[in-house]
Amino acid sequence: MIALAGQTPDVIAILPAAGIGSRMQTALPKQYLTIGNKTLLEHAIDALLCHPCISEAVVAISAEDRWFYQLPVAADPRVRVVTGGSVRADSVMAALRCASAASWVLVHDAARPCLHQDDLRRLLVITAHTEVGGLLATPVRDTMKRAHTGSDIIAATVEREDLWHALTPQLFARDLLITCLERALAEGATVTDEASALEYCGYAPLLVPGRVDNIKVTRPEDLALARFFFSQLANTESV
């Protein structure tokens, strides 16, 4: 549903946070590592709920999660919690089933704490001219290599001109996202992000240029970089 000119879209946010982040090599799941006095997950939630169009955040956590309910954000009436699944798409579907009614759904990584409000505003603007949705992304700048399958030997250099790094948030019409995720999961498709489910069903989401400092904390070295970027963000925005 396209938002009419001058009309604010109704949006709910989903944060899949059921993963354990094994590549971080930490005792805590990565979303519970901290920047300042808040976890990565709290920073991600805060950045979304700052925007007046986003009325609710649904967090999908593991059934074994023993950390979320200790966080102050767990008491926020705008935050709902659902038990997630073993893969991202299952967690997103679980959140969609319990979320309040809304025309649009925004999905954001729980370990991506450095979202700028300018990026979020640019993404939400697309609801005025698309019935599908889109995602924040950055053009690939480095030279890209493809390896032989199962090998660390270069097979080819990949043309980077039309390649983009997919980021989050990703924003889609709610009913369309549900339909595409259900079909992709039922047919055994590989769904690495929400956009890939829509692509599988023949839709073409929009790429919305975003900032390169909107990083996802995946490896140990990412946390120090995220802390630096967040310190810069705190100097320019009210966080």
Curated annotation (Swiss-Prot):
Q: Where is this site: Transition state stabilizer?
A: 23, 30
A biological-process GO annotation: isopentenyl diphosphate biosynthetic process, methylerythritol 4-phosphate pathway
Query: What keywords is this UniProt entry annotated with?
Result: Isoprene biosynthesis, Nucleotidyltransferase, Transferase
Against PANTHER family, the record matches this protein to:
2-C-METHYL-D-ERYTHRITOL 4-PHOSPHATE CYTIDYLYLTRANSFERASE, CHLOROPLASTIC
Q: Which family does it belong to?
A: Belongs to the IspD/TarI cytidylyltransferase family. IspD subfamily.
Q: What does this protein do?
A: Catalyzes the formation of 4-diphosphocytidyl-2-C-methyl-D-erythritol from CTP and 2-C-methyl-D-erythritol 4-phosphate (MEP).
Record protein name field: 2-C-methyl-D-erythritol 4-phosphate cytidylyltransferase
